[in-house]
UniProtKB/Swiss-Prot annotation:
Gene of this entry: atp-6
Job of this protein: Mitochondrial membrane ATP synthase (F(1)F(0) ATP synthase or Complex V) produces ATP from ADP in the presence of a proton gradient across the membrane which is generated by electron transport complexes of the respiratory chain. F-type ATPases consist of two structural domains, F(1) - containing the extramembraneous catalytic core and F(0) - containing the membrane proton channel, linked together by a central stalk and a peripheral stalk. During catalysis, ATP synthesis in the catalytic domain of F(1) is coupled via a rotary mechanism of the central stalk subunits to proton translocation.
InterPro entries named in the record: ATP_synth_F0_asu (IPR000568), ATP_synth_F0_asu_AS (IPR023011), ATP_synth_F0_asu_bact/mt (IPR045083), F0_ATP_A_sf (IPR035908)
SUPFAM superfamilies in alphabetical order: F1F0 ATP synthase subunit A
The keyword Membrane is annotated on this UniProt entry: yes
Protein name from the UniProt record: ATP synthase subunit a
Protein family membership: Belongs to the ATPase A chain family.
GO molecular-function term, one example from the UniProt record: proton transmembrane transporter activity
Organism in which the protein naturally occurs: Caenorhabditis elegans
Length: 199
C-alpha cells in the first residue's frame, strides 16, 4: 500500500493542470471572484484608485498574518502590539504622504478667512489628530483580536467543561469564531485605511 502508482501521479498532475496551469484555471477564477467581491464589499470609487489597491493589500496581508499565525502557533501576530504598531504606522504613513502630496494639504492646514490665532490652534489640533491615528489603529486591532481570542476560548472552555470533551464540533465552532474575528478585524482595519486615504 505504500507504493506510488503511475495512475496516482497521472491523476495528480491532471488535476493540477485545472488548478494552476490553464488561463481560466480554478485558482485564477477563485482569486478573480474574491477580489471582485472585495471591491463590492469595500464600495470603492474611481476617484482615488490607489486607495483600493492599498486597502485590498492591507486586508489580504492581515488575513494571511492572522490565519498563518493562528493555525501554526495558535496566536496571531496581530494580537502583538509590536507587529500591529509597525503595520499601523506604515499604513498611516502611506495615507499621510498621499495626503501631503495632494494640493488639498495647504487648504486643509489654513482655511481662507481665518485669523492667525485660529489657524495656529486648528493646526495644532489637526497635527495631534493626525499623529494619534496610528496609535488608535494599533490599539483597536490589538485589543479586538486579543479580546476575540479570549472570548472564543472562554466560550470553548465553558462548553467543554459543561458538555465534556467528546464533541468535536466544539473545536470547530471555536475555530470558526476565531476566523470570524480575524475577518472582521482585518476588514475594519483596511476600511479605516481606505477612509483615511479618501479624506
Amino acid at each position: 500500500m505504500n507504493q506510488v502508482y503511475f495512475l496516482d501521479i497521472f491523476m495528480f498532475v491532471f488535476v493540477l493542470q485545472f488548478l494552476f496551469y490553464f488561463k481560466e484555471s480554478m485558482l485564477n477564477t477563485l482569486v478573480k471572484k474574491f477580489l471582485n467581491s472585495l471591491v463590492g464589499v469595500f464600495s470603492y470609487t474611481n476617484t482615488l484608485p490607489l486607495s483600493s489597491v492599498i486597502s485590498i493589500f492591507t486586508f489580504i496581508v492581515l488575513l494571511t498574518c492572522c490565519f498563518g499565525g493562528y493555525f501554526t502557533y495558535s496566536f496571531c501576530p496581530c494580537g502583538m502590539v509590536e507587529f500591529t504598531f509597525v503595520y499601523a504606522a506604515v499604513a498611516w504613513l502611506s495615507t499621510l504622504l498621499t495626503f501631503i502630496s495632494s494640493e488639498k494639504f495647504s487648504v486643509y492646514m489654513s482655511k481662507p478667512g481665518d485669523t492667525y490665532l485660529k489657524t495656529l490652534s486648528m493646526l495644532l489640533i489637526e497635527i495631534v489628530s493626525e499623529f494619534s491615528r496610528p496609535l488608535a489603529l494599533t490599539v483597536r486591532l490589538t485589543v479586538n483580536i486579543t479580546v476575540g481570542h479570549l472570548v472564543s476560548m472562554m466560550l470553548y472552555q465553558g462548553l467543554e467543561l459543561s458538555m465534556g470533551d467528546q464533541y468535536i464540533w466544539l473545536s470547530i465552532l471555536a475555530i470558526m469564531m476565531e476566523c470570524f474575528v480575524f475577518f472582521i478585524q482585518s476588514y475594519i482595519f483596511s476600511r479605516l485605511i481606505f477612509l483615511y486615504l479618501n479624506e
